Structure formats: C-alpha cells, structure tokens
A protein has these predicted regions:
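Short, contiguous alpha-helical
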Residues: 2-13, 24-25, 45-91, 133-186
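Alpha-helical packing segments of well-folded alpha/beta enzyme cores
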Residues: 23-26, 30-34, 67, 71, ...
Length: 186
C-alpha cells in the first residue's frame, strides 16, 4: 500500500501547461460560469460581507468586470499596435475596492460582451502572435500566451472564490409578519 506524503503529492501534480486552445476555452467560459453562480443574487446578498477580510460578492464581480476591458485592451494593443510593453498585472488585477455601479445583469452582460471580443481576437492568432514577447515592469518578459495563462489562472481563482462565498451565504429567514406599532397609544 502506497503512502502519500505532501512531498509525494506535489510530485504527482500535473506540470502540463495550458495550450492556446485551453486558454481560449477557459477565457470564454469565465463570464458564463460567473453568471451561473450569481444570477439569482439580490442586492443584499451582493453586499453581504462574510467577515472583515473577505470581499463582497459584488466587489468580486466588479473586479472581474473592470479587469475584462483592461485585459482586452492590453491584448489588442500588443497584437494590433505592436506594443511591446504592458503592465499585465495591473490589467489582470485592478483594485478590489470597487462595488458594482450598474445592475448585476447589466454588469454580467458587459463582461460577456467584452470577453467575446477578446476571444474572437484570440481565435485568429497563429503561433507567432501567441509567442510574441511583451515586457511587464512587474513581471519581466513574457509571451502573450503566458499573459493569457495568468489571466485564466487569476479569473478561475475568482470563480472558485465566488462559488465558495456563495455557498456560505446565510439562508434568508422569515421573521413572520411585522407586528403593528402603536403610536401615541393608538
């Protein structure tokens, strides 16, 4: 019988890199997965904070929605304009301090629309585009494929975070009818 220690388990992890097809598939699935997890949330649940160190679901969704056009612009400028330097980390991970400024459904639709544009752009890329190197002031040099892999890993982590926070939302309680309030003895 084999004993699996943490060292053995680490050695068993897949070291396989995401292919371009994997990257495109995962990028295209994030808006739909996010929508599936949160479409039913009301405003109170979007603003519910599980604890002081936890973001609200609304702020996580806003984070993804705000990052999507930044990532799209970064990839478009690198591909179409030949830009060779970009702050990839700033595009992927803008501030977490935002809340949704538009209704949830509108934010999800905007996210899906922007992401469709990005995926349409990526579908036309050949090996030379994926292998194009850009310089990130915080991360050094990386290919556009590596930049997209970072985006996928970051966004999928947020999808898992949304799923987990969603599962921990308190169940609504029916407190019964509101008793009439007497004003001035009446």
């Amino acid at each position: 019988m084999a004993v699996f220690t943490p060292v053995n388990l680490e050695a068993m992890e897949l070291q396989e890199e995401m292919s371009t097809a994997d990257v495109v598939l995962l990028l295209s699935s994030v808006p739909e997965r996010t929508s599936d997890l949160v479409y039913w949330l009301d405003e109170a649940r979007l603003r519910y904070r599980h604890g002081p160190a936890f973001p609200t679901l609304g702020s996580l969704i806003a984070h993804l929605v705000v990052a999507a056009p930044k990532v799209d612009a970064l990839l478009r400028h690198a591909h179409l304009d030949g830009q060779t330097s970009a702050d990839v980390r700033a595009a992927i991970d803008p501030s977490h301090d935002q809340e949704l400024t538009v209704p949830l459904q509108e934010a999800l639709e905007d996210f899906a629309r922007v992401r469709r544009r990005t995926v349409d752009l990526l579908h036309g890329w050949g090996k030379s585009e994926w292998d194009r190197v850009i310089s990130d002031p915080r991360g050094g040099e990386l290919t556009l494929l590596d930049a997209c892999r970072l985006v996928v890993k970051h966004e999928m982590a947020h999808v898992a975070q949304i799923r987990n926070l969603n599962a921990l939302l308190p169940e609504p309680r029916d407190l019964g009818p509101v008793p009439p309030v007497e004003i001035n003895g009446q």
